[in-house]
Amino acid sequence: MPKRHLSMLRSFTPADALTIGNASCGTIAIFLCLEYVVAGNPRLLWLALFLLPLALLFDVLDGYVARLNKARQSRLGADLDSLSDVISFGVAPAVLGYTLGLRGGWDIFCLTYFVVCGVSRLARFNVTSAELADETTGKVKYFEGTPIPTSITIVLMLAVAFWVGRVHEHLWFGAYRVGPAFLHPVALVYALSGSAMISATLRIPKP
């Protein structure tokens, strides 16, 4: 007997709708960054900077709503949440950094490393969450490595930089030629954030 296909609309829960809000904010922020590069209108970038904290709010709320509605568990929830987080807290902050001047060869390496670490961290969590869960409550007691939404701190840092005019050729700490390419030291913040995400020894209690 053929298996019934999974109806996405019927499977969606209120928590899933909030997760889609998270992904939508991140996606629109990416497009706004691209439009800012073309048009140079600062309002576009301010809107992008606003949407990423809004994505974080959606991310927090979807978990809260899911816990309130335990009777209706989403079959899509965990994967949908991870994919949305990759967009809003991985790709979007990296695009934002590139938009504001991190365009040297080593900068791009750091931005790519950051995104790859975020993807890897979420994949590890999805695979190991059952093993890390408490036997009585079924809840994961701690995060291995920093959660990817902590990248919002980088977004806030870049918002301050944009506010005070320390972007593009005026980025803090300047730029240096390292071998075949240029590096802005600010890009190392992305590399550090990525490394913290994939750390196996850094354990953060889960609220």
PLM feature spans:
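C-terminal membrane-associated helical module and adjoining short loops/tails
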Residues: 1-3, 135, 139-207
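Topogenic membrane-insertion module of multi-pass membrane proteins
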Residues: 1-60, 200-202
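Interhelical loop and helix-boundary elements at the membrane-water interface
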Residues: 2-23, 64-83, 124-150, 202-207
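Multi-pass membrane catalytic core of lipid/isoprenoid biosynthesis enzymes
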Residues: 16-20, 24, 46, 67-125
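Hydrophobic alpha-helical transmembrane segments of polytopic
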Residues: 18, 48-55, 110-113, 117, ...
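Alpha-helical transmembrane segments of polytopic integral membrane proteins
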Residues: 27-30, 54, 58, 63, ...
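Helix-coil boundary and interhelical linker segments in multi-pass alpha-helical membrane proteins
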Residues: 28-50, 87, 93-112, 157-185
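Transmembrane alpha-helical segments that form the membrane-embedded catalytic/substrate-channel core
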Residues: 59, 115-128, 188-205
